[in-house]
Amino acid sequence: MSSNPSSVEKKLLHYTGKAIADFNMIRHGDRVMVCLSGGKDSFTLLTILNQLRIKSGNKFEIFAFTLDQAQPGWNDACLRQWLAEKSIPHEILTRDTYSIVKEKIPEGKTYCSLCSRLRRGIIYRYAEENGFNKIALGHHRDDLIRTLMMSILYNGDIRSMPPKLLSDNKKHIVIRPLCYVQEKDIITFASEQAFPIIPCNLCGSQENLMRKKVASLIDQLAIENPKVPSNMLHALQSLKPSQLMDQNFWNFKNLEDGLETAQSVQCEEVFNAQEFEFEDEKI
């Protein structure tokens, strides 16, 4: 920890440490691979985790992993120098996913989905081959609530980015220690630390990404009610299945069985859902 940490640094240490404790993200002896993209979020994550590692008495390891996806203009010289100065173990691995994305995705379409899928596969494989049992990503509070809003508006489901995730193949635990941290605090901290930010030119060239629209919408709502972002984060931790419509989580069809006056006899349904089906129906 810095000898005289700034107020925002103290705030980051507090909320990151709280998230780690709340969700048991890091245990004694864990080998944590921090995905360092070169952006403000991942630089902040690595810096704060390194300070917490020292604070813990080195009860866990951290390793910085950077994937060079062969994007035009990529220059990691400053990144390498920064990592060397911090004495943080690291590797910068080059894999040309850029050419694949440009070939597969038509001009004008968003690259994010394919790009992230390719990147995720490489990250998982590297972690497994090198014995890292935790993979740390730099998503913050605002990423979580924007993803929630995007899922509702554009995908028609309720999901976000969990603070701790077991991968589908059951081989990896992914953690998001910055899940309580506000983006504005990361911006302030990144400026204080003068991180050698490497911009993502691939994504930055697409001005009409859905995420930017949703971020703008949330910002507008927060002007009228500053509690909107924190309320959205709280909503992710306060699901009430009985107040929603998902029959996988609440037995709406047989609620009558819970009545104090419920009869033990099986009652026949008046209608069958198949009677009202239409082809390609979507309410």
From Swiss-Prot:
Task: Cite a single GO BP annotation.
Answer: tRNA thio-modification
Grouped into one coarse class, the protein's main location is cytoplasm
Q: What Pfam family is a match for this entry?
A: ATP_bind_3
Task: Give the EC number.
Answer: 2.8.1.-
Write out the pathway annotation from the protein's UniProt entry.
tRNA modification
A single GO cellular-component term from the record reads: cytoplasm
The alphabetized UniProt keywords are: 4Fe-4S, ATP-binding, Cytoplasm, Iron, Iron-sulfur, Magnesium, Metal-binding, Nucleotide-binding, RNA-binding, Transferase, tRNA processing, tRNA-binding
Residues spanned by motif PP-loop motif:
37-42
Query: Could you describe the subunit structure of this protein?
Result: Homodimer.
Further information in the entry reads: The thiolation reaction likely consists of two steps: a first activation step by ATP to form an adenylated intermediate of the target base of tRNA, and a second nucleophilic substitution step of the sulfur (S) atom supplied by the hydrosulfide attached to the Fe-S cluster.
PANTHER family documented for this protein: AMINOTRAN_5 DOMAIN-CONTAINING PROTEIN, SULFURTRANSFERASE-RELATED
Q: What is this protein called?
A: tRNA-cytidine(32) 2-sulfurtransferase
**Organism of provenance:** Legionella pneumophila (strain Corby)
